[in-house]
């Protein structure tokens, strides 16, 4: 309430949600590619409206079919059965702009290492579920399971994934190891 006793209206932030758009283009493209691949159930390179509806239902975000068609239909090219990855990126960008405003373009070189570091830390925290500063095989397995990835079924496979980036051989991934791994990822088509 303000001084006159009137309840203040909540203000909506126009900044992008850090969970919706990452500042680091490579991380954002990688995340979008993973989401695209999960939504594309049959692996044909297109997300149909049925696949989109199923994915949203699985996430607990059931969408009205007519509303989904109205929102997504304009991004499906003529003659295509569904969204290709580029179309999916355009839809994601348009939704982000509509919900949070357009991304402010920065001068080349101005986007500092602070932004990249912040994105890396945010991504690390997704995996470090207990907040102890390390990603254990159990934590990685839990995240892979939430993403519906088949690697989550076998703990030995998950432990091998950990070993591939665990430079100090302590059986878990610290932030430095995570950062090196993420910086070594090449995103094709990004």
UniProtKB/Swiss-Prot annotation:
Record: residues binding Ca(2+) 1: 40, 42, 44, 46, 51
Residue sites binding Ca(2+) 2 per the record: 128, 130, 132, 139
Record GO terms (molecular function): calcium ion binding
Record: residues binding Ca(2+) 3: 166, 168, 170, 172, 177
Entry superkingdom: Eukaryota
PROSITE patterns linked to this entry: EF_HAND_1, EF_HAND_2
Any matching Pfam family: EF-hand_6
Keywords assigned by UniProt, alphabetized: Calcium, Metal-binding, Repeat
Domain EF-hand: 27-62, 115-150, 153-188
Function: Potential calcium sensor.
Protein name in the entry: Probable calcium-binding protein CML27
Organism: Oryza sativa subsp. japonica (Rice)
Lineage: Eukaryota, Viridiplantae, Streptophyta, Embryophyta, Tracheophyta
């Amino acid at each position: 309430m303000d001084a006159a006793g009137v309840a203040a209206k909540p203000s909506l932030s126009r900044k992008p949600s850090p969970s919706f758009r990452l500042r680091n283009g490579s991380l954002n493209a990688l995340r979008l590619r993973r989401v695209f691949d999960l939504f594309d159930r049959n692996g044909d390179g297109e997300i149909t409206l049925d696949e989109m509806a199923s994915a949203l239902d699985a996430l607990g975000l059931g969408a009205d079919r007519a509303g989904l068609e109205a929102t997504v239909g304009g991004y499906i090219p003529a003659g295509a059965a569904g969204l290709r990855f580029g179309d999916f990126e355009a839809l994601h960008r348009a939704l982000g702009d509509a919900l949070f405003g357009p991304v402010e373009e920065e001068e080349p070189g101005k986007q500092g290492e602070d932004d990249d570091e912040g994105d890396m830390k945010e991504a690390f925290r997704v995996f470090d579920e207990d907040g102890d500063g390390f990603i254990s095989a159990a934590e990685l397995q839990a995240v892979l399971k939430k993403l519906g990835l088949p690697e989550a079924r076998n703990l030995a496979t998950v432990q091998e994934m950990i070993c591939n980036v665990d430079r100090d051989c302590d059986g878990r991934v610290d932030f430095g190891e995570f950062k090196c791994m993420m910086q070594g990822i090449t995103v094709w088509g990004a």
